[in-house]
UniProtKB/Swiss-Prot annotation:
Reactions accelerated catalytically: Cleavage of peptide bonds with very broad specificity
Species name: Bos taurus
Classification lineage: Eukaryota, Metazoa, Chordata, Craniata, Vertebrata
Primary role: The proteasome is a multicatalytic proteinase complex which is characterized by its ability to cleave peptides with Arg, Phe, Tyr, Leu, and Glu adjacent to the leaving group at neutral or slightly basic pH. The proteasome has an ATP-dependent proteolytic activity. This subunit is involved in antigen processing to generate class I binding peptides. May participate in the generation of spliced peptides resulting from the ligation of two separate proteasomal cleavage products that are not contiguous in the parental protein. Required for adipocyte differentiation.
UniProt GO cellular component terms: cytosol; nucleus; proteasome core complex; proteasome core complex, beta-subunit complex; spermatoproteasome complex
Protein's name in the database: Proteasome subunit beta type-8
Upregulating conditions: Up-regulated by interferon gamma (at protein level).
Length: 276
């Protein structure tokens, strides 16, 4: 309530903070992901959409409270005969400002699962860390690793519960299980897609241009590394919100390995010199 006083929220907005009602279906059994009292939960005023709550802080509506965050990045992943390649840039922007060039946008969920960050960094980190916890609990309960499909479905279910609440996340979940390499795209609306190639972020159209022209399922390992590297470098060259270094991972049958972390400026100079 003190926070509401500081923010100057209207008196009518002072509802109880979100607590499951008596008789609520929310519970903490292993198969339920309702984030009830025994699980991490977002504190929200009951009966109010977060977007409406933030809008109410503007009083007469002239303060223009901005909840649509400006952000940019370039991440990509694709499957080929030797596994999955994940490549990302490392620039983090805050509106029109560059916050840092040293962000690792690949989240290491476990030795056989990787997730990428695109959108709001806080949302991606929070939900994918929560996914890592659920994957670990699955392993402890069942004695085997969770499949890539099931892990992506868990994340999709989490997003569906908070659909329309202002989250911003476009993530790729990749890994290796009994069925081989897997690659899924999940966003803040709960959309879940399986495919051989995905790219997210403000520079994804530039990355797709390179990948579409060079992708083949039968790429060799070095060809796959070069394709992912070139796609990120081209995107950072054309997209002002992407930059820094190329962080590349290779998902193999025995787990992921980090391939390289190379400055995009050095790579661009190398490509220009090679073309002359």
């Amino acid at each position: 309530m003190a926070l509401l006083d500081v923010c100057g929220a209207p008196g009518g907005q002072r509802g109880d903070w979100a607590v499951p009602l008596a008789g609520s279906r929310q519970r903490s059994d292993p198969g339920h992901y309702g984030f009830s009292l025994r699980s991490p939960e977002l504190a929200l005023p009951r009966g109010m959409q977060p977007t409406e709550f933030f809008r109410s802080l503007g009083g007469n509506g002239e303060s223009k409270v901005q909840i649509e965050m400006a952000h940019g990045t370039t991440t990509l992943a694709f499957k080929f005969q030797h596994g999955v390649i994940v490549a990302v840039d490392s620039r983090a922007s805050a509106g029109n400002y560059i916050a840092t060039l040293k962000v690792n946008k690949v989240i290491e969920i476990n030795p056989y699962l990787l997730g990428t960050m695109s959108g709001c960094a806080a949302d991606c980190l929070y939900w994918e860390r929560l996914l890592a916890k659920e994957c670990r609990l699955y392993y402890l309960r069942n004695g085997e690793r969770i499949s890539v499909s099931a892990a992506s479905k868990l994340l999709s279910n989490m997003m569906c519960q908070y659909r329309g609440m202002g989250l911003s996340m476009g993530s790729m979940i990749c890994g290796w299980d009994k069925k081989g390499p897997g690659l899924y795209y999940v966003d803040e609306n709960g959309t879940r897609l399986s495919g051989n190639m995905f790219s997210t972020g403000s520079g994804n159209s530039h990355a797709y241009g390179v990948m579409d022209s060079g992708y083949r399922p039968d790429l060799s390992i070095e060809e796959a590394y070069d394709l992912g590297r070139r796609a990120i470098v081209h995107a950072t060259h054309r997209d002002s919100y992407s930059g820094g270094v190329v962080n590349m991972y290779h998902m193999k049958e025995d787990g992921w390995v980090k391939v390289e972390s190379t400055d995009v400026s050095d790579l661009m100079h190398q490509y220009r010199e090679a073309s002359q």
